[in-house]
């Protein structure tokens, strides 16, 4: 019983000493700022109001009498009292009507500014501010990767804007964009051309876009140098490919086609050899 009384007296003595030190610290700050000493009374009352509940059990008997739940509750109460001491100047400013923002508060994000009053208002429980933080909207800030890209790259990623891609990114060998390989041309030029490239292929979707955009100024794509032209007749094609052989085949075919016609005019049936000759030349024509 004597030890209990001594522990209680020791606790009360330490409590008074802490309160006196806190009051002296606040009075010293008030004197440095030139404020009256009466403003420290609400702070002292606020500090004393947070000390609620019976005094803790003596350290010599704590390990025998306290349960794990009581220990957690005691630690939580100590944490809440420390947080209330930290945020008590902010509460004092709002009570006195001083709502001016601190320069450090201006640099905070909206979520951090919302977290500070939430922690001070919910002094009964430290984690009461977590739901309010979850309900706050996200900060609408620009992504850091967007700052490294140029304005042309950001504009090309917009689907509503039709722009000209760079020369290395184009997959068509003919582009009619004003921004060509040699730079920008005048806006009033009649047509847009660029030299053909044998390595790239032409995209029909891109060509259709330029055909509709340029109208009469649009020029058809020029064929590649190694491409085969399909202009001219079939006879010219085989004459260039086969030479004299094609002329012989064509002469034999003409003679074979004329002999059945002459025989039918005389009323005589056509000889089977003529049909054989005409059929024998047909595979060579196909080849």
Curated annotation (Swiss-Prot):
Keywords: Nucleus, Phosphoprotein, Transcription, Transcription regulation
Region of interest (Disordered), residue spans: 44-68, 251-287
UniProt subcellular location: Nucleus
GO BP annotations, alphabetical order: negative regulation of cardiac muscle cell proliferation; negative regulation of cell growth; negative regulation of DNA-templated transcription; negative regulation of hippo signaling; negative regulation of Wnt signaling pathway; positive regulation of protein catabolic process
Modified residues (Phosphoserine): 58, 271
Highest rank taxon of the organism: Eukaryota
GO cellular component: nucleus
Pfam families: VGLL4
Regions of compositional bias (Low complexity) in chain numbering: 275-287
Segments forming a coiled coil: none
Keyword flag Transmembrane helix: no
Subunit note: Interacts with TEFs. Interacts with IRF2BP2.
Job of this protein: May act as a specific coactivator for the mammalian TEFs.
Family from the record: Belongs to the vestigial family.
Protein name (database record): Transcription cofactor vestigial-like protein 4
The organism of origin for this protein: Mus musculus (Mouse)
């Amino acid at each position: 019983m004597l030890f209990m009384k001594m522990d209680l007296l020791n606790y009360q003595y330490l409590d008074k000493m802490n309160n006196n030190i806190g009051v002296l610290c606040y009075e010293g700050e008030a004197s440095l700022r030139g404020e009256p000493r009466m403003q420290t009374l609400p702070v002292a009352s606020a500090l004393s109001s947070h000390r609620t509940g019976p005094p803790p059990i003596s350290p010599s008997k704590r390990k025998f009498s306290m349960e794990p739940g009581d220990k957690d509750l005691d630690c939580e109460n100590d944490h809440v009292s420390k947080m209330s001491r930290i945020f008590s100047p902010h509460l004092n400013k709002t009570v006195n009507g001083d709502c001016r923002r601190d320069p450090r508060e201006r640099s905070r994000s909206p979520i951090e500014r919302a977290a500070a009053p939430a922690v001070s208002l919910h002094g009964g429980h430290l984690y009461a501010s977590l739901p309010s933080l979850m309900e706050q909207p996200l900060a609408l800030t620009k992504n850091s990767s967007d700052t490294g890209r140029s304005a042309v790259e950001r504009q090309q990623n917009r689907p509503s804007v039709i722009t000209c891609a760079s020369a290395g990114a184009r997959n068509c060998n003919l582009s009619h964009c004003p921004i060509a390989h040699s730079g920008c041309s005048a806006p009033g030029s009649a047509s847009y051309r660029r030299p053909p490239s044998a390595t790239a292929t032409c995209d029909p979707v891109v060509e259709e876009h330029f055909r509709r955009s340029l109208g009469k100024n649009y020029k058809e794509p020029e064929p590649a140098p190694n491409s085969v032209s399909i202009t001219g007749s079939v006879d010219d094609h085989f004459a260039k490919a086969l030479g004299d052989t094609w002329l012989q085949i064509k002469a034999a075919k003409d003679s074979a086609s004329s002999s059945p016609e002459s025989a039918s005019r005389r009323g005589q049936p056509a000889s089977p050899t003529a049909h054989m000759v005409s059929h024998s030349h047909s595979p060579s024509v196909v080849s």
